[in-house]
Amino acid sequence: MLDKTKRYLIVGLGLLGGKYALELSKAGFHVDGINRSKGHLQYALDHGYIASGKTHDFEDLVSQADHIIFGLYPTALIDWFKTYGHLIKPGCIFTDVSGVKTGLVEPVQAMCPEGVEFIASHPMAGRETSSVEHAAEVSFAPANFIITPTEKNTPEAVQWAKELAEVLGFRHICTLTVQEHDKMIGYVSQLCHAIAVSLMCANDNSSLCEYTGDSFRDLTRIARINEKMWAELFLWNKENLIAEIDQFDSALDQLRDALVADDRDKLEEMFRLSTQRRAAFDKKDS
């Protein structure tokens, strides 16, 4: 079990950073916070997410932390670490929440001071909304938590990440390589967002709300998107995402060709396959 005498620091009190702070504080851990926005920091203080926090002159919070959780975009995390990473004390194990690992894990691990360890992880949870004000709405209970260790990580760090996920309330915890993670995320997350965004951009649907059913609402829920974060994640993982888009295009072309050819058998074959795969997914997910 995690040592409750250890001090935790959340860098970036957004949706996920705020949720980590909330859950750790509820579990009895001392949690401090660093955030650019004074208003969001004050919200976290007022609602008991953190014990203390700063927007600047926070070097003391960094040097006191036993564990750090970075709720930053990949580029911002690397930039922050270049400036303040030397302040992290030996023995500190820290992690992130980023949805892309290639291009992030290796450079940050290379910059770690002696005795400091970065174990990357990805909470597969979130909402269409952002900011700490919506952190309490996020549910970790049904979500997956992915740890992406490298050869530079110790068994102790991997175990800490697993125990952190358990304290936060994640139902399923697994490990993948950095490369496996980014390939998988290109399909199960980024492609889904790309499809939802494309569907909303393909047609002026401003007058459709009176006529749409659940299928349109369900499929486009994630099209309400944080444009800065997702643009960065797409670009950082563009090779994997482009490959998934090409594969999706191929499947959509098969369906289109079947329509053009009035090929009912092909349509029914595709529908049966999708139904079977969804049923298998539901069974594993239950």
Question: What function would you assign to each model-found segment?
Answer:
Residues 7, 30-32, 117, 144, ...:
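Residues at the starts of beta-strands that form the adenosine-phosphate
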Residues 207-277:
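Interdomain hinge/lid region at the active-site interface
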